[in-house]
A protein has these predicted regions:
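Periplasmic c-type cytochrome electron-transfer domains
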Residues: 1-264
Length: 264
């Protein structure tokens, strides 16, 4: 309730109203005032910043809302909103192209698992485009966290500040690790979606299909990793790509690569 006092001289009136919306609880499938809810106590709902706390993430999971049959719904990690201003694809698989569209359809689909009948039963709030644009303007103020060892223009390591293993990791990142083919500096993403075809390694599983490239800026602060949180640590994430892309990195290569990513 103190957002106005904290930000009234820092944000524009439009951004302040967007922040108000991001902090306002709205009914959701599991958290609402009806008897059909998951929580023991009835509530007005949840806010955007309940999961994206301070514009970052609490690392909570949910199931994607738009897959049918429902047993094929997959787990999704809550991503950080840091650096959202510089991202052109929103939603791991839905490929929404604006923050405004994502903010609107998050309420209409994800909040009620894509079931419009449940939505109206439990109190869906229909946001107009003015409200949505205010929310988007506030979200577009969220910047990447500081990275003191990176050159502010190129996004590459400053060799005067970086350690030897961090510099070796950078060389692997842009070389045999093939990381930069998708994670392009200075934002370390390419605004595209890619299919790793992990079904090659599974039996009777359809795989994930195309998943958007997530930024690696500030990656050390937002475990677990990958779109569904299957990698608990950066080390796990490096090993995942080492196996899927058949990179054959050595143990030292992987340590150096993690050291580099911790500076992003």
């Amino acid at each position: 309730n103190n957002y106005y006092r904290l930000f009234k001289d820092l944000l524009t009136p439009v951004q302040l109203d967007g922040l108000r919306m991001l902090l306002t609880p709205f009914p959701q499938e599991e958290f609402n005032p009806t008897d059909d809810r998951k929580a023991r106590e009835a509530s007005l709902g949840v806010t955007c910043f309940d999961c994206h706390v301070n514009g970052h993430t609490t690392a909570q999971f949910h199931l994607n809302p738009d897959t049918r049959p429902e047993e094929r719904r997959m787990r999704l990690d809550t991503p950080s909103l840091r650096g959202l201003f510089n991202q052109q694809i929103h939603g791991s698989k839905r490929s929404l192209r604006s923050v405004e569209d994502f903010s609107e359809f998050e309420f209409r689909t994800a909040y009620f698992n894509g079931d419009h009948i449940h939505a109206f039963k439990k109190g869906v709030v229909i946001l107009d485009r003015v409200q949505v644009s205010h929310m988007a303007q506030m979200q577009n103020m969220l910047d990447f966290p500081p990275a003191p060892k990176l050159d502010p223009i190129t996004g590459r390591l400053d060799p005067r500040k970086a350690s030897e293993n961090e510099l070796r990791g950078e060389k692997i990142f842009f070389g045999k690790g093939q990381c930069a083919s998708c994670h392009v500096p200075p934002t370390y993403l390419d605004h595209q979606m890619h299919d790793l075809h992990v079904e090659r390694f599974l039996k009777d599983e359809p795989g994930d299909g195309p998943i958007k490239t997530f930024t690696l800026r500030g990656i050390k602060d937002s475990p677990p990793y990958l779109h569904d949180g299957r990698a608990l640590t950066l080390e796990d994430s490096v090993e995942f790509f080492n196996l899927v892309m058949q990179l054959k990195l050595s143990a030292q290569d992987k340590k150096d690569l993690v050291a580099f990513m911790r500076q992003l």
